[in-house]
């Protein structure tokens, strides 16, 4: 009888262990899924904060995301990397929401040397804000931290050079500078598409990844960038009216991969 019970236990024990393991894995999966949803919700909240703090900055990061995705797709980046590029573009200036920097960016006067030094801390501050999400978005903070690095190693905050700069940051750097040149800032007027194109070309191999610059300046990519700019500058009411009459050009063939709310040599100040 005792031997029979032991034999039965030998059969039951593996089943019990297997069931317990399955249960633990299921609970772990549910907890991770919940944490991922909370992380995504946190990113959405941060994007809302960017909009609420400065509508101009909100428009800027969305345009940068659009241009970065155009360049990333042309470079043949895989879907995961494109997700990362988009997130870095949308949150590259999140560090500017730090209390010590908010007043500086809302002040319309020219930056003082002290203010310039303070502004240059925004990549680190942004990476710090995003650090709690690094378990789910490990490349996001790295890209935000490096978006002001330069190909020749003279950027900040760490002076990274060449391909030591994360790819997502190299892509976003070009898109960020292009948008800064073509839109009015507190310290400069908006310049033309042609001026911006020449400035990006001038930064090839010094400020920017030369291969990405070649791609950005190729006719197919520039055509998409130009189309995206026209779409972004068109007033919302006019867009709706044109769509009703069937007169509007289609929006650029770019799909935002993360945000459900997608919208539509440079001077040193322009890189802040």
Task: Identify the meaning behind each predicted range.
Residues 1-49, 246-272:
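Non-catalytic interface/linker regions that flank or bridge core catalytic/transmembrane domains
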Residues 52-62, 66-261:
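Metal-dependent catalytic cores of enzymes that make or break cyclic nucleotides
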